[in-house]
Regions:
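Charge-biased low-complexity segments
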Residues: 13-251
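Sec-dependent N-terminal signal peptides
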Residues: 1-11
Length: 251
């Protein structure tokens, strides 16, 4: 499993200097940085699927599937974001909600800040991570998965948690051309009209890259309708971001 390698990378010894370290193992290609504070940044590609992970975080109480982190995706201010907890990690390893966007941010930035909110009797913790100027190993992993090294659409991505839910889910149909992998996902951002119908949608991230699922998902989204979680009227022109997934199982 790709998450198993990321968990292993997060547990390895600290690297002697600040570089992206390349790893190749059984068809998986990865790049990682390990910091003396115990945090690890990792990007990995396997079978066309690209993931970006943070490792070495304080463990969580309970068994939640997601973890909220404040990150400097729009430096210098921190913004709230929700990450998926890697299996068997107790929250110490989390997967980015938009791996391509985060990877591109790290290759073009000088630093990355992470704040882990307080939980139970543990205080909030903040990490200020300097990034290497040489990102050749990271670029190689992104290229192996067909991830673009630059994308102007990254500028409009908002990682903050949603305040809307589907009142009427989109009419989902199987993609006309199935992705080469058995799993595909698309990150889409839309504005809404006064009735809560999505409009002016943009594909922000797609995994596997260039699988065609993103274009298919873009066509499905406008068939749904959203409403605010608190029951207040939807603000016309408001913007929301959603993730749509597709998976195939063998019978």
């Amino acid at each position: 499993m790709i998450t198993a390698l990321l968990l292993a990378l997060a547990q390895e010894a600290v690297a002697p200097d600040l570089t992206w370290t390349a790893t190749k193992n059984d068809g998986l290609e990865a790049a990682s940085i390990q910091y003396d504070v115990g945090v690890t940044l990792s990007a990995a590609c396997r079978n066309g699927r690209f993931v970006f992970a943070l490792g070495g975080l304080p463990t969580m109480t309970g068994s939640a599937a997601t973890r909220k982190l404040d990150v400097s995706l729009r430096a210098p201010a921190l913004v709230s974001s929700t990450w998926s907890v890697a299996p068997n990690s107790n929250g110490s390893v989390v997967l980015a909600p938009a791996p391509s966007i985060y990877a591109r941010h790290l290759r073009s930035s000088e630093s990355f800040s992470i704040r882990v909110p307080a939980e139970a009797d543990r205080r909030a913790q903040r990490y200020e991570l300097t990034l290497p100027r040489d990102h050749t190993a990271l670029d190689a992993v992104m290229t192996a998965c067909g991830v673009a090294l630059e994308n102007a659409a990254d500028a409009i991505y908002d990682p903050r948690p949603l305040d809307v839910v589907w009142a009427i889910p989109p009419r989902i149909t199987p993609p006309p051309n199935l992705p080469s992998a058995n799993y595909a996902e698309a990150l889409i951002q839309c504005s809404v009209d006064r009735r809560g119908r999505p409009k002016d949608c943009t594909l922000l991230d797609e995994n596997p890259p260039r699988s065609g699922f993103g274009r298919h998902a873009l066509r499905m989204v406008p068939s749904g309708r959203v409403e605010r979680i608190d029951g207040a009227p939807v603000q016309e022109g408001g913007v929301f971001t959603m993730r749509m997934t597709f998976s195939m199982t063998e019978h």
